[in-house]
Amino acid sequence: RSTQGYSSAASDVYKRQIVGDTKQLPNVVTDDIKAKAKAIFDRFNVSEGYQYTNSFLQSILDVMPNVTQTLLREHYRCHPKIINFCNQKFYRGELIIMTTDKGEEDVLSVVKTVAGNHERNHYSQRQIDVIKNEIIPKYVSNPEETGIITPYKNQVEALSKEITDIDAATVHKFQGKEKENIIISTVDDE
């Protein structure tokens, strides 16, 4: 009954707004699943806009390609050095960075692990060891204000077993949480 009321109310609305960011990370779909899904999509002639391997926002844009899009340019969350990387890499310099640099050290660091094929089944013990033995001792003074994000559930499970005092989650589950420090475990070698 309440669903009928909602759909009736929604049908009376003249305009709808969908808020999202096409530059954010897409759904994590493995190559194996993509291949199986493509076979199904091809077999049943499922158009691009209705394929679940797309994000919801990308599906909307595929189904309604002429819809008006507005970039929300002002960015208030990340340190300027962090968002400037994203601004140059993904947004063609279109964002207006509204935060200020207060001279903090080590705002953005990259730690490369030893070369080699360490990733197996979306899990990398080598990266966990580096995070636990090198990154946390050097950079983390307050575990409660630190989070570890990774694209893969298997890596989250392994991280959570070995590093119990720091929250670890997939990129999508961590989205919207606020932590002073974020460690990113990419897992994949390339």
Regions found by a protein language model. Name each.
Residues S7-E190:
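Conserved helicase motor core of SF1/SF2 NTP-dependent helicases
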Residues S2-T3:
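Short, exposed "boundary/linker" segments that immediately precede the start
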